Amino acid sequence: MPWIQLQIPADPDTADQLEDLLMEMGADAVSMEDAADQPLYEPDPGTTPLWSQTTVTGLFQSDRNIEQLLADIRDAWHQQTQQSLADIDVTLVEDKDWERAWMDDFHPLQFGERLWIVPSWHEAPDPDAANLLLDPGLAFGTGTHPTTALCLEWLDGQDVAGKQVTDYGCGSGILGLAALLLGADHVVGVDTDPQALEASRDNARRNGVEDSRLDLYLPGQDPDTRADIMLANILAQPLIGLAPRLAELTRPGGHLVLSGILFNQAREVMDAYEPWFVMDEPEQKEDWIRLTGRRKDG
């Protein structure tokens, strides 16, 4: 059975409302995509931005009357906004195993020489490597974004055996778990989102990591444990505000690894950390950079 696919262009002010309308009209699924291949840069605190050009896509069952469906959507939109909705692209798409098609798009990813991120349905390409089982599509990070890749590549290039690691803003736990698989002794993960902490714990168990090797906390509840390696893949402004706390939690001589920073933000972030760390030159991947440094004595 084919599906009726409706695609409607929207701006950031109307995309959420349009998504709700399509669901009210009986869509089986609604998604939003970037219509112009634009990156989303750092948002203001408390905002959830969308692209300046967004395509809202709704899938409807094929037994719907298309002309009536379009008329109902346009009428409802006009009632809600007093605006017209003329530009609706209609196509019929084949019915297929969408989950299988989605899974086929994702393959194991290698970071450096020793580390792989492997979707759970794939065989590990190198059974002797550090293979982190992690499924794409999680909201909290799976290694596909340049900011995460920069951190994973750094970890792969280090001797982390026996080290104490803190992953501040841990999300899925990807960085801390990678460190553990590469030989770190213990990881403290911190995140503002309780669901992220749950995701980290679930991923740890999936990878056979003992609970005793990974402690997870909300900010303000984490102990004053000083790390040999401090990882923080967040965003520039939160990183700037966290500089004193991350310095406090890093032992003298310990490594600092920061990501989630755009190239033009590097200097401001480096300035925030230089009172406590000797900072290295930035490492860039696409529009993003990684900052590293060593904790000064004292």
From Swiss-Prot:
S-adenosyl-L-methionine binds at residues 148, 169, 191, 233. One of its GO terms (molecular function) is protein-lysine N-methyltransferase activity. Keywords: Cytoplasm, Methyltransferase, S-adenosyl-L-methionine, Transferase. It comes from the Bacteria. Disulfide bonds: none annotated. Pfam families: PrmA. It is found in: Cytoplasm. GO terms for biological process: methylation. CDD domains: AdoMet_MTases (cd02440). It catalyses: L-lysyl-[protein] + 3 S-adenosyl-L-methionine = N(6),N(6),N(6)-trimethyl-L-lysyl-[protein] + 3 S-adenosyl-L-homocysteine + 3 H(+). Belongs to the methyltransferase superfamily. PrmA family. This is Ribosomal protein L11 methyltransferase. It comes from Marinobacter nauticus (strain ATCC 700491 / DSM 11845 / VT8). The gene is prmA.
